[in-house]
Amino acid sequence: MNIMKRNLCTFAMIFLLAVGFAVCSLNTAFAQSDPAEETEQSNSREGFSAWEISDELFERMKSGRTYKEDCIVPREDLRCLLVLHKDKDGNTHQGEMVVHKLIAQDVLEIFEKLYDAGYPIERMVLPDNYLADDETMMRDNNSSSFNFRFISHTNKVSKHGLGMAVDINTLYNPYHKFVKNDDGTQTEVIEPATGKPYLDRTQDFDYKIEKGDLCYTLFIEKGFEWGGDWTDRKDFQHFELPTEVTERYSEMYESTSAQKAS
């Protein structure tokens, strides 16, 4: 009987040691896991995610003309955001937006808060659906970010070309500027042209961005600047990173591109 008790005790000790070793091994495995994977899991929320550009999406961007042949922004520096957004009637939609990885997490968090608050965004599809045509896309009130292009008459990449600017509810928050002509006259520029009725910002209408509203506040808190604050022109749909930030990336990409070409 004593022998049986000793054997049972021995077996119990071996079992407990084995379990303890297994638990320690499991804890060690978690401790040594990829931090990025842990962060992704802890920050994940159904309907909101950021992804690297897949082969399928990359082909779509090339055929849709947002990633043009002369694009100097590396594919690996871009992220595709999948988010939920609500229209003015409270209907939920799945949106997608390609941005630079530098702003991906911030923009993802902004869209989460806008969705939770029911802030209306009518449409959010990639510019490739419009063959990267800005006017057509803006008339459709589409919200977007990355669309590669250089600033006119320069070799500088625009902020949308870097994926570091975001346009929201474009039809109802148009771009407006007066351009001086050689003869001293001025030409009024409104983009989209169909956005003219919404230049009067004293009026109340759906999808309007106002200084101090939730969309404005969230972007400003993340360090963006709003085109509605500009004095030489107005771009009510537009949020962008400061020039001192974007120029560093633009110069880096230009330098890398020049080295590859030489």
Spans of model-derived segments:
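Bacterial N-terminal signal peptides that target proteins for export
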Residues: N2-A12
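Active-site acidic/histidine clusters and adjacent loop/turn architecture
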Residues: V73-M138
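Structured segments of extracytoplasmic/periplasmic soluble domains
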Residues: L84-K86, A104, E109-P120, R149, ...
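Mid-length scaffold segments of soluble, non-membrane domains
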Residues: I121, T136-L171
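Sec-dependent signal peptide cleavage junction
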Residues: F21-A36
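Bacterial N-terminal signal peptides
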Residues: A12-V23
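Catalytic cores and adjacent binding grooves of peptidoglycan-active enzymes
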Residues: I151-H153, T170-S262
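N-terminal module-boundary/linker segments of secreted carbohydrate-active enzymes
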Residues: S33-N91
